[in-house]
């Protein structure tokens, strides 16, 4: 089987994945697939660090703004959507470039979960609604009943495991159809932390507070509201924190999230990391991708 070559750009939040993805897409006739669990939601732009309108005009983006904030989204759905996007991009002779920091989503796609038959999406949604009615303890007990074990026990991962088990007949855990080049962006911890702090400040200047308040006033309990960037500001809206305290909490939680992202990518994926402050870093990455694709740079 001839595998489809794809480029995957990963790394901690605020490291510059979007800019690199657009640069590669423009140079190599590519299109971008978002691998971020929060960027699927419409109306949540600032807090999710979604590609701006200008950036989306510079390169075609897929899997952005495909869900309402009231809807849930899972790794299972991402795999299905990403496979369709990859097939579409390749059919038009273009290079799929996946950009994102949600390790679970990317690992699920790259490790070989392929949709064999036609999955009844209404059945998937109905099953998830049933699970949503259960307490955490009941969800964990259901894992035991089905003899399902997961490495790190939390509700979201437990529900994903139950979904995969429930619809196993429609899934083929086969050799992956993709040959990925996984590019990791990173740098010294303080460099990353400084970029995170600066990004949060820019987000607040660019409308994050208004976006978070809209979400808090209308949909405070939905899955989308649990993402980093929104829930940290909720205490400010009810007078439990000052804006400065909420901002500091957001920066701290984002730094912790970046650390978890790096741990995931290092332990679970074959990532070749490049320091973003290294000399000629963009050119080095471009050359690596061209080598992977068997291309020579045009003179």
From Swiss-Prot:
HAMAP family: IPP_trans (MF_00185). One of its GO terms (biological process) is tRNA modification. Its EC number is 2.5.1.75. One of its GO terms (molecular function) is ATP binding. The record marks 102 as: Interaction with substrate tRNA. Catalyzes the transfer of a dimethylallyl group onto the adenine at position 37 in tRNAs that read codons beginning with uridine, leading to the formation of N6-(dimethylallyl)adenosine (i(6)A). It catalyses: adenosine(37) in tRNA + dimethylallyl diphosphate = N(6)-dimethylallyladenosine(37) in tRNA + diphosphate. Keywords: ATP-binding, Magnesium, Nucleotide-binding, Transferase, tRNA processing. Monomer. Belongs to the IPP transferase family. Substrate binds at residues 13-18. This is tRNA dimethylallyltransferase. Its cofactor is Mg(2+). The keyword Magnesium applies. Coiled coil: none annotated.
